[in-house]
């Protein structure tokens, strides 16, 4: 079983280097970074990292993944689809640029997908802060996901390639592409809700205040569930940020 990790980026210079350093040690086959038009040093950091990894003096403990840096029109769904189209791996794992996978991520995915009825899944999430509120947010995200059967991008969604193609890839919409995708994915078969944790940055909540961010996210998801267009939600999101 071959597994590709696909990371969409847009101005992620502050964190992409650390994420690449960690992810390349985990034994994946492809590592595909898809840039949606960064204006910072994201591209330069990725290219320098790839050059260093493949340098003759480099001595990794295991063969490094095939690293590719692509560009695509801005929009997370477009970037994810572009990355998926560039890989022929059996399994696609979609990872945020500020998120680190557990050390056993590859084995956990392989074990989950050894069940032929399982079409994909996600990991539990933990925020990289010791604040009690951060722990509460992570726990609530995991409970909400298990209760609803829906995964979000923070949780590192993975899927069999053939199922990804069969259900129509990510719908190219400005928001909620992860929720819309996993709605379709869970109709295709069983999802694995792995207890192993990815660690993601608390910065998104800190930038605009944790409580304000939680309220905004819950409001957006509620409006989406009752049928408000993602394009209208994008307009609302820009207004209140």
Language model region names:
Residues 32, 43-86:
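Conserved donor nucleotide-binding strand/loop of the catalytic core
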Residues 92:
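Short aromatic/hydrophobic "clamp" motif used to bind/position activated sugar donors
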């Amino acid at each position: 079983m071959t597994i590709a990790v696909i990371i969409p980026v847009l101005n992620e210079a502050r964190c992409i280097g650390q994420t690449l350093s960690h992810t390349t040690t985990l034994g994946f086959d492809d590592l595909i970074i898809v840039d949606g038009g960064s204006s910072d040093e994201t591209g330069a950091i990725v290219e320098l990292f790839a050059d260093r990894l493949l340098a003759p003096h480099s001595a990794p403990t295991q063969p490094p993944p095939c690293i590719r840096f692509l560009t695509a029109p801005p929009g997370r769904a477009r970037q994810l689809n572009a990355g998926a189209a560039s890989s022929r791996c059996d399994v696609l794992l979609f990872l945020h640029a500020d998120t680190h996978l557990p050390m056993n991520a590859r084995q956990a995915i392989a074990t989950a997908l050894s069940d032929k009825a399982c079409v994909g899944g996600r990991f539990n999430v933990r925020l990289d802060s010791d604040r009690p509120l951060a722990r509460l947010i992570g726990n609530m995200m995991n409970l909400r996901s298990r209760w609803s059967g829906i995964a979000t991008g923070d949780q590192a969604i993975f899927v069999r390639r053939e199922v990804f193609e069969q259900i129509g890839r990510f719908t190219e919409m400005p928001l909620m592409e992860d929720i819309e995708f996993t709605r379709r994915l869970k109709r295709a078969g069983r999802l694995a809700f792995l207890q192993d944790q990815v660690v993601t940055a608390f910065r998104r909540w800190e930038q605009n205040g944790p409580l304000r961010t939680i309220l905004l996210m819950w409001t957006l998801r509620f409006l989406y569930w009752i049928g408000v267009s993602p394009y209208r939600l994008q307009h609302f999101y820009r207004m209140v940020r």
